[in-house]
Design a protein with these regions (language model features):
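Surface-exposed intrinsically disordered loops and tails
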Residues: 113-141, 178-185, 225-230, 274-288, ...
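Substrate-binding cleft of secreted/luminal carbohydrate-active enzymes
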Residues: 341-469
Length: 532
């Protein structure tokens, strides 16, 4: 990664009102000199990289911490431990982004200054800072005041925040509802909540992103409750709803990153959204299935269009392992390559390879202990996905910090008091660090925790690297022409040989140099990959 002297180029960057014109729109926040509350907004460049205001690439590597979405009115775990101490631990362990699940219902409660339905689940004896009196055993503050204290602490600790609209209604099983609206909270209510949230924090770049809706899903068994993705304006068309919501958000703050998740199913070739889920007489499947929020097949023909704000779009799939559900791609002997070929590529990885937009894996996680994962298959999947994200700089937020996620566990246990060092050791290589192992913040001023550095520290003191003259180099096996030879080249070549339209470098793909591209090249490439 190139390091650029911020001071040398700051004036030039600020003087320009738009960069990467056209499809990527403006990537510079303002023509005015930004203060420390406005200098950390992030944008997307033409290479589908998330960059800071100076054009420096960044890597969002965070975790999830839930509670606000389930009725606790605060992060879970604050019922026993001190909230500031837990946030400090998250920062010290190097997580530079916190994805916080919330609900439309909660945001509208705060907007209207309505009372908490119940006292927030806060231990007033271990959290005196969160009491009205500021003393041990005092009266617990209003939940929105507690939340704003958390925002302040995150800022000081170098943690950025992404709000996730996890569900319309506040409920422990709210994520089970497939759409962004219910009979109690409409699409218009969702818009209203998003607009209020955006306006309230438009001058605080601690909150850098909004995940518009967690895991839109649903199948054709109940068509009215199925999130779909097409060019219609139907009420359950997630693409249209996401574009409308993003437009409203970006009209208030054009600097927020907009995370758009996928859906669950997409019609197979020759079928459309009117097809039934399955023909049981012939056992014919009419839809491609995926994890909830993990299906972006529709984005190939109908990508999200944010107009002049396209530079704020990030696609955000979720991915889980066999302990959550035994998907077909978790067959015996599965590998990173087999999952890529059978699931990842067509559902979301193609978006990154084609530089349509960056990817942020909004949820990934699971058990790795012998009791829960005796055959190691879940750990194997986690390792495959982690390595994929490291190699391709896929942004991510691990699920989760909480110990009380029933099908995954968390980074802590023992009533939020002890870190799972084995699980953290698996995640740690995928956290953004410099060559000395220092964690890197997304904030230009504040370092991330006690073991990290600020973004300015990381990018300071280096002269800009001038581009060298482009030289086309033949790299045998580099089928996708990304200057590396790895399993993604094997996947691309396999698709090409199978007759699937695939953009490849034919010179590099001719692995055996016989002037033809075929199965023999694929065999030789796979032998090479196995050897090395």
């Amino acid at each position: 990664m190139k390091r650029i002297n911020l001071k040398r180029i700051a004036a030039a960057v600020i003087a320009v009102s738009s960069v990467f014109a056209g499809v990527y729109g403006s990537t510079v926040p303002s023509a005015a000199e930004p203060d420390e509350y406005h200098d950390d907004w992030l944008h997307v460049n033409e290479n589908a990289e998330i960059v800071d205001m100076y054009g420096n690439p960044v890597w969002l590597t965070g975790c999830n911490w839930f509670g606000y979405n389930v009725g606790s009115q605060v992060f879970d775990g604050v019922w026993s431990r001190n909230m500031h101490e837990m946030l400090t631990e998250i920062a010290d362990h190097g997580f530079n982004l916190l994805r916080v699940p919330m609900s439309t219902q909660l945001l509208l409660q705060w907007k209207n200054n309505e009372p908490d339905p119940a006292t927030p689940k806060i231990n007033e004896w271990t959290n005196p800072e969160l009491t009205v009196e500021g003393v041990v055993g005092g009266k617990v503050k209003y939940s929105f005041d507690v939340w704003n204290q958390a925002v302040k602490w995150c800022r000081e600790l170098g943690i950025k925040i992404m709000i996730d609209i996890h569900s319309a209604e506040t409920a422990s099983a709210g994520h089970q509802v497939s759409l962004w609206y219910t009979d109690k909270y409409s699409t218009e209510d969702w818009y209203e909540a998003l607009e209020w949230l955006t306006d309230y924090y438009k001058d605080d770049d601690t909150l850098i992103a909004i995940d518009l809706k967690n895991e839109p899903h649903g199948k054709a068994d109940v068509p009215s409750q199925m999130a779909k993705w097409d060019d219609s304006k139907d009420p359950n068309n997630w693409k249209y709803a996401a574009e409308c919501a993003a437009e409203k958000v970006l009209a208030i703050n054009a600097n927020l990153l907009i995370m758009v998740e996928g859906i669950e199913v997409y019609p197979k070739e020759g079928y459309d959204w009117t097809a039934p889920a399955k023909d049981w007489t012939t056992n014919t499947e009419f839809y491609y299935g995926a994890w909830w929020g993990g299906n972006f097949r529709g984005a190939k023909e109908n990508p999200i269009d944010l107009g002049e704000h396209q530079s704020q779009l990030v696609y955000s799939p979720h991915d889980y392992g066999p302990l959550v559900y035994e998907q077909s791609w978790f067959h015996e002997g599965f590998t990173q390559e087999s999952i890529m070929e059978e699931y990842w590529y067509d559902n979301w990885f193609y978006l990154l390879e084609e530089k349509t937009a960056p990817l942020l894996m909004g949820e990934w996680g699971g058990f790795i202990d012998e009791q829960h994962d005796p055959d190691g298959s879940n750990t194997k999947w986690l390792t495959c996905l982690r390595d994929l994200m490291i190699e391709n700089r896929i942004h991510h937020t691990f699920w989760c910090f909480n110990e009380n996620s029933g099908d995954t566990g968390g980074l802590v246990y023992d009533n939020f008091g002890t870190w799972d060092e084995d699980k953290y050791a698996l995640v740690k290589p995928a956290l953004w660090k410099d060559e000395n192992g220092k964690f890197i913040s997304l904030d230009h001023k504040f370092a991330i925790g006690a073991n990290g550095i600020s973004l300015s520290d990381y990018y300071s003191g280096q002269q800009p690297t001038l581009p060298s003259e482009s030289i086309d180099t033949l790299i045998k096996g580099d089928v996708n022409n990304d200057k590396k030879v790895n399993i993604f080249d094997s996947v691309a070549l396999k698709r090409f040989v199978a007759g699937i339209e695939t953009d490849i470098d034919k010179n590099n793909a001719d692995f055996n140099s016989d002037g033809n591209i075929g199965i023999s090249d694929l065999i030789q490439l796979n032998k090479f990959l196995i050897k090395y």
